[in-house]
Amino acid sequence: MNALLELKGIERSYPAGEQQIKVLDDVTLSIYAGEMVAIIGASGSGKSTLMNILGCLDQPSNGEYRVAGQNVAELNNDELAALRREHFGFIFQRYHLLTHLTAEQNVEIPAIYAGAAKAARRQRAIELLGRLGLEDRIYYQPGQLSGGQQQRVSIARALMNGGQVILADEPTGALDSHSGEEVMAILKQLCEQGHTVIIVTHDPKIAAQAQRIIEIKDGHIMSDSGTQVSRKITQTPSLTSKISSIRQIFGRFNEALFMAWRAMVVNKMRTLLTMLGIIIGIASVVTILVIGDAARASVLSDIKEIATNTIDIYPGEDFGIDDPVSKQALKIADADAIKVQPYILAVSPEIEGQMRLRKGNIDVSSKVTGVGDEYFQVYALRFAQGIGFSLDMIRRQGQVVVIDKNTQRKLFPHQKNVIGEVILVGNMPATIVGVIANRESAFGNSKLLHIWLPYSTMTSRLMNRSYLDSITVRVKDDYNSKDAEKMIVQLLTLRHGKKDIFTDNVDMLVKAAEKTAHTLQLFLTMVAVISLIVGGIGVMNIMLVSVTERTREIGIRMAVGARTSDVRQQFLIEAILVCLVGGVLGIGLSYTIAFIAQLALPGWHFVFQPIALLSAFACSTAIGVIFGFLPARNAARLDPIEALARE
């Protein structure tokens, strides 16, 4: 009969400074299926190290170890995990149950890593616990169970995937005599059912209950009572209800997500404090994007209210150059020539001056602008009362005037409707035909008085001149204002025979404002991103602490068959989940901030663009991956023996 477990010349040494301490020396041993073996020895004899090598938790420094003919040294980490998962079941002296899980959930862990279907593993866990007399303790957590009951849960976990080989390390060491007897009776029964049971103990009474006793001292096998397998070996039951590889991967991810969520819920305060940096960072980024967009839209709306797609044409070379000849370059005919161009929506000649206004005993100074009939369309001005100028008023040099709200309040402090009233502009009587409404603007409203007359009235009746101070044109929306500006300059240069005018494109102001707003928003976003990175570093720090605190849990998971990728995935998912939940709460906080800001700034419109929300989630995920990778990698690299030894 071939040996199930075969060791040849096994040695195990550990470094101690510059020396090597040999714990096992030339151990040669064969264990057959169906045996109940007791390995007995005093503390420091090497019995626990031998058990760890038998259970593939540790590897020998020298020698050869075969499991069912397979040389263990030829297996990689994942293959070793599969061997532990599918062939071995561990029973520890201190039970090594996960305190935040129920008895059933603890028993299910090996089957989760084996990729078993959820319903099948749950049914088997309940069945095993029932067989061990714990049917009424299925949903109890370890802290609610006695020592004997916890050890029975540990036995059920060892049997979950079949447990062909049961490795029991001092299984009765932490139990009272009655509970110890019950555990030994269960182990004997398992041996009778076909399981290979290996007990590591220092107690001769426990060892005497085994069929075979191997004594170890100072790393050497001192005695071996020999193999006594006479019964027929039966097939050990195992959990065979597996799922397809794709569904298995999805199932493992789903379980890792569920376990990560449970770990977060168990440590609520720590999780919340970990999230705090992410919440503030995400809220900052989203709020800056939303409020920045609202502020930019408000400013641009105000600029466009002043004039959009407009070009101002001035005589001379530039502002501040006072040349009497160039000052007279613009004529009414130039405005007429521009008006017929296909890219022009509206044109208005302009003449400006400062004059006295009188009504009764009220005498004030006001800015006066002579304009064309399309001026109010060019500047998108709204009328509170009346209308603008008609072509007929322009042609007959009408003594009509449009005033602003400031002028109305000054000249008619107690009168609401002023249409048809006559005021003196200089010495010329003029009838009011319209009142311009105030603009609601982030820039505020002007306190100056401003009135408008037909430009023909200004040139002939008040100023006695034929040239213009400027011409304002509005370009059609489907034309590029920059191209239109070039064509206007070319047209007037051709008409005048030289370039004696210059232009001011209001769209350049709009673009400059957009650029400034974008730059400011980018700067504030970078500040918010820095806070987000700080939050990410906080997540990494807490996760590193979590790995240290949960080292024993990691060792337990590895002992029952978790791959390094399973451990890495679980801690990475925890980090990502913390960041995603923090991201959701951060977005919620930004909605609250925007709601408060909306109450304070009713003229602004706060819109949460999908791209901003998607960016927030993308940032949360990226931070979870980036700052969760190091803790996850550290967790996956832990040695299961060292991890299990941690308290």
UniProtKB/Swiss-Prot annotation:
The family database entries (SUPFAM superfamilies) matched by this protein are listed as: P-loop containing nucleoside triphosphate hydrolases
Q: Which InterPro entries does the record associate with it?
A: AAA+_ATPase, ABC3_permease_C, ABC_transporter-like_ATP-bd, ABC_transporter-like_CS, MacB-like_ATP-bd, MacB_PCD, Macrolide_Exporter_MacB, P-loop_NTPase
Its BP terms in the Gene Ontology are: response to antibiotic
Q: Which GO terms describe its molecular function?
A: ATP binding; ATP hydrolysis activity; transmembrane transporter activity
Q: Quote the record's binding site residues for ATP.
A: 41-48
- Report domain ABC transporter positions: 5-243
At the top of the EC hierarchy, this enzyme's class is translocase
**Mainly localized where?**
membrane
EC number(s) for this protein? 7.6.2.-
| CDD domains found in the cross-reference section | ABC_MJ0796_LolCDE_FtsE
The answer to whether UniProt assigns keyword Cell membrane to this entry is yes
- An example Gene Ontology cellular component term from the record? plasma membrane
**Parts of the chain that traverse the membrane:** 272-292, 522-542, 576-596, 610-630
Keyword set, alphabetical order = Antibiotic resistance, ATP-binding, Cell inner membrane, Cell membrane, Membrane, Nucleotide-binding, Translocase, Transmembrane, Transmembrane helix, Transport
Protein's cellular compartments: Cell inner membrane
Q: How does it sit in the membrane?
A: Multi-pass membrane protein
**UniProt keyword annotation of Transcription present:** no
Q: How does it assemble?
A: Homodimer. Part of the tripartite efflux system MacAB-TolC, which is composed of an inner membrane transporter, MacB, a periplasmic membrane fusion protein, MacA, and an outer membrane component, TolC. The complex forms a large protein conduit and can translocate molecules across both the inner and outer membranes. Interacts with MacA.
Query: Which family does the record assign?
Result: Belongs to the ABC transporter superfamily. Macrolide exporter (TC 3.A.1.122) family.
According to its UniProt entry, the function of this protein is described as: Part of the tripartite efflux system MacAB-TolC. MacB is a non-canonical ABC transporter that contains transmembrane domains (TMD), which form a pore in the inner membrane, and an ATP-binding domain (NBD), which is responsible for energy generation. Confers resistance against macrolides.
> What is this protein's name?
Macrolide export ATP-binding/permease protein MacB
| Species classification | Bacteria, Pseudomonadati, Pseudomonadota, Gammaproteobacteria, Enterobacterales
Its gene?
A: macB
